[in-house]
């Protein structure tokens, strides 16, 4: 699973706000191919955030499938995530895709894996990718010991992961959802 070693995606939920951010580095083995990739998307009219780690083509395929599930299920994040995970696990072509997703709406944050897992993390903090453990640790420390806004926690967590993980850079894209955002 070499493809998973290439990014950091982290999400933090605090109060009525959720932020999802990722770095911009794409690597092929140990070579940086691109430094400004967009691994975070707003879906379903801006009401859902999605971020991916893993093979780029695989992740785009999964994002498209997830968006189709959102349309089919009127934006219901939980049902859409479970349906995608079921397809991912049982469909012969999808089973070969190597990627992970974090998706979030105003109420839930979920990690979706190719093993058929749909996980809702405790404390509203989720991270995936090669720098995910570093970002999650930083996010948890900041979340528990400060009152910083979720987007600030995500930014600082990505900075820390970028300082430690060679597959994570400092070109960040962070999207938010909250009561002040027009969706």
UniProtKB/Swiss-Prot annotation:
Q: Where does this polypeptide localize? A: Cytoplasm
Q: Which HAMAP family match?
A: HslV
Q: Which Pfam families match?
A: Proteasome
Q: Has UniProt tagged this entry with the keyword Iron?
A: no
Q: Which UniProt keywords apply?
A: Allosteric enzyme, Cytoplasm, Hydrolase, Metal-binding, Protease, Sodium, Threonine protease
Q: Which example biological process does GO assign this protein?
A: proteolysis involved in protein catabolic process
Q: What is this protein called?
A: ATP-dependent protease subunit HslV
Which GO molecular function terms does the record list?
A: metal ion binding; threonine-type endopeptidase activity
Q: Which organism is it from?
A: Chromobacterium violaceum (strain ATCC 12472 / DSM 30191 / JCM 1249 / CCUG 213 / NBRC 12614 / NCIMB 9131 / NCTC 9757 / MK)
Assembly behavior: A double ring-shaped homohexamer of HslV is capped on each side by a ring-shaped HslU homohexamer. The assembly of the HslU/HslV complex is dependent on binding of ATP.
EC supergroup of this enzyme: hydrolase
**Which EC numbers does the record give?**
3.4.25.2
Q: How is its activity regulated?
A: Allosterically activated by HslU binding.
GO CC, alphabetical = HslUV protease complex; proteasome core complex
Its catalytic activity?
Answer: ATP-dependent cleavage of peptide bonds with broad specificity
């Amino acid at each position: 699973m070499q493809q998973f070693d290439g990014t950091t995606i982290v999400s933090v939920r605090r109060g009525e706000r959720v932020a999802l951010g990722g770095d911009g580095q794409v690597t092929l083995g140990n070579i940086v191919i691109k430094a400004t990739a967009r691994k975070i998307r707003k879906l379903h009219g801006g009401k859902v955030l999605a971020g991916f780690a893993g093979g780029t083509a695989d992740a785009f395929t999964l994002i498209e499938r997830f968006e189709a599930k959102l349309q089919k299920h009127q934006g219901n994040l939980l049902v859409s995530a479970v349906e995608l995970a079921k397809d991912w696990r049982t469909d012969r072509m999808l089973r070969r895709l190597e990627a992970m997703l974090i998706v979030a709406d105003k109420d839930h944050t979920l990690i979706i894996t190719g093993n058929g897992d749909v996980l809702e993390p405790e404390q509203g903090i989720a991270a995936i990718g090669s720098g995910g453990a570093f970002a999650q640790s930083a996010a948890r420390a900041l979340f528990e010991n400060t009152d910083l806004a979720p987007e600030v926690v995500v930014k600082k967590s990505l900075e820390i992961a970028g300082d430690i993980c060679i597959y994570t850079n400092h070109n960040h894209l962070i999207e938010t959802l909250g009561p002040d955002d027009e969706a």
